[in-house]
Amino acid sequence: MRYDKLTIIGLPKKFKVYYALDYLYPDGQLPDNPDEILYDEWPADGDEGEDAMMVYEYNKSATGVYLAYNENVHALSFELSPWASDADVKLYVKLANAVLKKHPRTKLYAQYDILKGLTEEDEKKMIADRQSYVKRLLKTKEGFTMEGLFHGCTLKDAHLRPAPTLDIQARDLRQLFADMQWEKEGKEEEKQ
């Protein structure tokens, strides 16, 4: 898929991946009011010598964005799942552009291509890629497993709601999957 793995090279030695989310806020730091916090993260497993985390947007993300910072080469890697919701794609683009803006001497690589940043057009193409990926899987009429932030789901053809077109069915499924991540999480918290 288009730009599903990106790397920013040339970050300063003092860069910490855990502060990357702060770049998305106007003052460069988390708001004092917890209700104004839109994004969050949790530590993830990275390769040796890497600090990694999953970044997500509350109530909208399906898979989140995987970030890994390698201190040895001063590189920040971004990864986006094929199951990512539109909100995940937007977060991915915002975060990459925010890091580039904060550190203007860095370079953004998509495999061997150097990019100046991600555009709105790139964002639309990335969303369309994910939509067509789900559509292609729906055409096979076979089951498949979607991995999310909090929950995965194995889907069989019998589970699908009928829709007038495959486009609508794929869009509805992607939205339902994103909503499912947050509904189940809320129900589990109520039980505790």
Question: Locations of the language-model features?
Answer:
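Acidic (Asp/Glu-rich) sequence patches and key acidic residues
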Residues: 1-192
